[in-house]
């Protein structure tokens, strides 16, 4: 069964963007390439259990096993040594990516307290969008009772768009609730 958001992209978004930006080929229309979820766990330096919990939560949210990230260099101020595990990340592509984006837009973001839309200034100039989530509780897979500590995560949506405007239109057409 094809994903609801992927069908919407094929049937509605491609024709709309082709008309707006006058693309000559269907392949020129921007699409979502991948979504990267990153959870930096700074307190994992002193307590490795925190990193395990964070990785387990990230696995629940994304549906795949996270990659443990390690410190690239030592920083004495943070009591950090090179090679120490300090975070977890997941790269979603294909079906899982569309499922996650659909869930993020329709279920998770509306659960954020005092939500007025995601900021429009978080584009990087190359058509990629970054979103910070302050608490992992907005995702339906995370049970309130199982959470030992509120952790945030970064969500990076990488698109094939060349400009921020094209990327914004793509995400808006896919249902991303941008702030007015």
From Swiss-Prot:
GO cellular component, one term: ribonucleoprotein complex
Superkingdom of the source species: Bacteria
InterPro entries reported for this sequence: Ribosomal_uL5, Ribosomal_uL5_bac-type, Ribosomal_uL5_C, Ribosomal_uL5_CS, Ribosomal_uL5_dom_sf, Ribosomal_uL5_N
UniProt-listed GO biological process terms: translation
Homology family: Belongs to the universal ribosomal protein uL5 family.
Molecular function terms from GO: rRNA binding; structural constituent of ribosome; tRNA binding
Record's keyword terms, sorted: Ribonucleoprotein, Ribosomal protein, RNA-binding, rRNA-binding, tRNA-binding
Signal peptide: none
HAMAP family the UniProt entry points to: Ribosomal_uL5_B
Gene3D superfamilies (UniProt xref): 3.30.1440.10
Subunit architecture: Part of the 50S ribosomal subunit; part of the 5S rRNA/L5/L18/L25 subcomplex. Contacts the 5S rRNA and the P site tRNA. Forms a bridge to the 30S subunit in the 70S ribosome.
Record function comment: This is one of the proteins that bind and probably mediate the attachment of the 5S RNA into the large ribosomal subunit, where it forms part of the central protuberance. In the 70S ribosome it contacts protein S13 of the 30S subunit (bridge B1b), connecting the 2 subunits; this bridge is implicated in subunit movement. Contacts the P site tRNA; the 5S rRNA and some of its associated proteins might help stabilize positioning of ribosome-bound tRNAs.
Protein name per its UniProtKB record: Large ribosomal subunit protein uL5
A UniProt-annotated Pfam family: Ribosomal_L5_C
